[in-house]
Amino acid sequence: MQSCGTYAPTTRALVSLLRSFARSFFAFLLLLVIVFHSSVAANTKSDLVGELMLAFVEQGDTLSDIARSYNQGYTEMRLANPAIDPWLPQAGTDVIIPSLYILPSVKTAGIVINIPEMRMYVFGTSTRENSFEMSTYPVSVGRQKWGTPHGAMTITMKLEDPAWYPPDSILAEHAANGDPLPKVVVAGPKNPLGKFAMLLSEKGYLIHGTNKPYGIGMRVTHGCIRMYPKHIKKLFANTKSGTKVLIVNQPIKVGVDAGIIYLEAHPSLKENPGDLASRYAETMRLLDLQFGSDKFKLRYLAVQKALRLENGIPTSIGVIGDNVIR
């Protein structure tokens, strides 16, 4: 795998890896697939970016605390660690940090947001067919009845210290819940937009910060894209008005690295449910679309297992060409 990603191993991560290695055979197996990256330079001969890591629970941690420390969202941490109590995890417990990703299947520069994954990918000026620079961030998206719109749009305006003008629909919702809002929420700690906001060409929708960072990585917004304060600050500084934004619905992603085919599966949106058979058919369609001109061999049981787990972690399912399947 080529050098690529936004995460460098932290001291805590390295300590946790050593502790976990000493404690369990599982940790040894996980270390076999860890890929360390530095900077954000990438070569698209690999469709995978980032690094898979182990951490451990310190006394008083919640899973949300660990997620925030490692630039993760809540849901992706829950999917990767389903057996761990998110609010009262036992101190010393191993925690998988699922920060290894298959790139979305897109051909565009700019910002790409994958709704089921609740993750943003920011590509440089060229497409994934060439060398590019890329960053990735967890995001919150619209809940079921307030879904985030899909499709192509652009950044139309950037606002620092924005005031929030809640639309009538949100004013009515809060009033019905006994939590009335003012017609204008001024900039400051009570403003849910945070310190930075970028307006989208889809009227009424924004990419913005938050005053409730522990909600990042959940379907909790009224359709806007919400980011950790430190991430929106960086994105705001490096994004121009007119930047392209593409919002997609890709619960299943496939990619290749060093001749090995990987599958990354996330739960489908509740408004677009799919059973195992339909998800399997979609996986085969994606494989034919990406590798149709090449020979490839699959471990079909591995495909089915990944689709059942839906844990968001790239899983080896086969090989390209005449490589030996393992």
Residue positions per predicted region:
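N-terminal secretory signal peptides that target proteins for export/translocation
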Residues: M1-A22
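Bacterial N-terminal signal peptides
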Residues: F21-H37
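Primarily a LysM-type cell-wall glycan-binding module
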Residues: A42-N71
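Loop/turn positions that initiate beta-strands
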Residues: G60, G92-V95, G242-V245
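Solvent-exposed, polar/charged alpha-helical surfaces in well-ordered, non-transmembrane soluble domains
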Residues: S64-R68, T75, L79, H222, ...
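Cell wall/extracellular polymer interaction/catalysis modules
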Residues: G73-T75, Q90-P162, K270, R285-R326
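Short acidic beta-strand-loop surface patches of small beta-rich interaction domains
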Residues: R78-P86
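Exported/periplasmic cell-wall-interacting domains
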Residues: I170-R326
